[in-house]
From Swiss-Prot:
Pathway: Antibiotic biosynthesis; clavulanate biosynthesis; clavulanate from D-glyceraldehyde 3-phosphate and L-arginine: step 3/8; Antibiotic biosynthesis; clavulanate biosynthesis; clavulanate from D-glyceraldehyde 3-phosphate and L-arginine: step 5/8; Antibiotic biosynthesis; clavulanate biosynthesis; clavulanate from D-glyceraldehyde 3-phosphate and L-arginine: step 6/8
Gene it is expressed from: cs2
EC number: 1.14.11.21
Cofactor entry: Fe(2+)
Signal peptide (residue range): none
Broad EC category: oxidoreductase
Keyword Membrane: no
Protein name: Clavaminate synthase 2
GO BP terms: antibiotic biosynthetic process; clavulanic acid biosynthetic process
Lineage: Bacteria, Bacillati, Actinomycetota, Actinomycetes, Kitasatosporales
Binding site for Fe cation: 145, 147, 280
Assigned keywords, A-Z: Antibiotic biosynthesis, Iron, Metal-binding, Oxidoreductase
Similarity annotation: Belongs to the clavaminate synthase family.
Entry-linked Gene3D superfamilies: Clavaminate synthase-like
CDD domains found in the cross-reference section: CAS_like
Length: 325
């Protein structure tokens, strides 16, 4: 089985040269910035381009691709943010450029209207008192979830670029792949979960200001090709009611636990998670609130799979919420 890690250290100079051709202030005209990134992505180093294209075409058993050894800002990196969204005039960071170039090789960077003020580029950093379902938690486990599994236009990929790791390098991004978990499920469980609509709650941002609207969406835990299915899973939000559904989801949950792998992100990493075939989580870490805490850059990528695109969309668009029914 091919390694999910791509060593990008040989490409650093080429990638820095490509990054320098991008507009200096991404958020001043994000559509234009990402259009230019698409053009430049055609000139990515051959080995990197091939790895991205293969992952986009067929995925992998692991369910993720880790680009390691990319160039970083190092001494020029500003302090870890403490608020969101980022200032519109913030200059391009190297890891933002890497995320743009790799992401445009895959598909369309997308914002979600109800999430992070509809912004496309997200800074991910610890925040005191963050909701336990939020990516801004730090000292509690961020539980396994397929990102926005309840959204009719859920992203195909979640990209996490690392500018700064946590101080003790404790935080792990955990990934559970359905391709690894499926062989652990018996035929009865597979049949129960396949194309079965299970009630699902939604994240706080999508609740329309209501504290607890209940399970307003329906998610199929397994769907697509029965022999190579897609995954819809959220440990906190999936809310099966039928006893047989509860049992089947519990078996799936255990299987995903059994195949989980951990990835410790370090500066210069871009982790690309196949959000149609995996669930992911993050282990706790301890922030110091010293301006040097863990700092990731997140973006969601849509492709033409599963009816995500109808035509005419652009990278940098923001879309509104429609729950799966």
């Amino acid at each position: 089985m091919a390694s999910p890690i791509v060593d990008c250290t040989p490409y650093r100079d080429e990638l820095l040269a490509l990054a320098s051709e991008l507009p200096e202030v991404p958020r001043a005209d994000l559509h234009g910035f990402l259009d230019e990134a698409k053009t430049l992505a055609a000139r990515l180093p051959e080995g990197l381009a091939a790895a991205l294209d293969t992952f986009n075409a067929v995925g992998s058993e692991d369910g993720y691709l880790l680009l390691r050894g990319l160039p970083v800002d190092d001494s020029e990196l500003p302090e870890t943010p403490t608020s969101t969204p980022a200032p519109l005039d913030r200059k391009r960071l190297v890891m933002e450029a890497m995320r743009a170039l790799a992401g445009r090789r895959l598909g369309l960077h997308t914002g979600y209207q109800e999430l992070r003020s509809g912004t496309v580029y997200h800074d991910v950093y610890p925040s005191p008192g963050a909701h336990y379902l939020s990516s801004e938690t730090s000292e509690t486990l961020l539980e396994f979830h397929t990102e926005m599994a309840y959204h009719i236009l859920q992203p195909n990929y979640v990209m996490l670029a690392c500018s700064r790791a946590d101080h003790e390098n404790r935080a792990e991004t955990l990934v559970g792949s359905v391709r690894k978990a499926l062989p652990l499920l018996d035929e009865k469980t597979r049949a129960r979960l396949f194309d079965r609509k299970v009630p699902c709650c939604v994240d706080v941002a999508f609740r329309g200001g209501v504290d607890d609207p209940g399970a307003i969406a329906n998610v199929k835990p397994l769907y697509g090709d029965a022999n190579d299915p897609f995954l819809g899973y959220d440990r906190e939000l999936l809310a099966p009611e039928d006893p047989a559904d509860k049992e089947a989801v519990a078996h799936l949950s255990q299987a995903l636990d059994d195949v989980t792998v951990g990835v410790k992100l370090v500066p210069g990493d871009v982790l690309i998670i196949d959000n149609f075939r995996t669930t992911h989580a993050r282990t706790p870490f301890s922030p110091r609130w010293d301006g040097k805490d863990r700092w990731l850059h997140r973006v969601y990528i849509r492709t033409d799979r599963n009816g995500e695109l109808s035509g005419g969309e652009r990278a940098g668009d923001t879309i509104s919420f429609s729950p799966r029914r």
